[in-house]
Amino acid sequence: MKDNNIKLSLLMKSVEQPLMKTELPEIKVGDTIRLGLLVKEGSKTREQLCEGVVLSRKKRKSLNTSLTLRCSFQGVGVERVFFLNSPRVTFVKVIRRAKVRRAKLYYLRDLLGKASRLKQIFN
């Protein structure tokens, strides 16, 4: 049984490897990123920019790698989940890094204004 699981995981890795994006920067929880997303409206396709704080990250080295991004549109906080290896994601750029001591920053949902700021890391 164990040998079958090992063979299956190797098969999955060999199938996923060509589909994964290699030019993605290192993204950590707490980073402020700008993400380009292809949006189809009718017959036209345009690129939509989304900028916000990364609240969580799941499955780091997999085809299903996703992150939860908290943006604010017109004064309202919006959270979206993005799959990083999706063909709809055109680019990811890290704008600012922050020092955080948690793996998930869900507590930022309840904070307003200056309280929701994170301590910035200067490189």
Curated annotation (Swiss-Prot):
Localisation: Plastid, Chloroplast
Keyword Transit peptide set for record: no
Lineage: superkingdom: Eukaryota
One Gene Ontology term from the biological process aspect of the record: translation
Keywords for the protein's UniProt record, in alphabetical order: Chloroplast, Plastid, Ribonucleoprotein, Ribosomal protein
Cited Pfam families: Ribosomal_L19
Cross-referenced InterPro entries: Ribosomal_bL19 (IPR001857), Ribosomal_bL19_CS (IPR018257), Ribosomal_bL19_sf (IPR038657), Translation_prot_SH3-like_sf (IPR008991)
Molecular-function annotations in GO: structural constituent of ribosome
UniProt family annotation: Belongs to the bacterial ribosomal protein bL19 family.
Protein name in UniProt: Large ribosomal subunit protein bL19c
Originating organism: Porphyra purpurea
Gene name of the encoded protein: rpl19
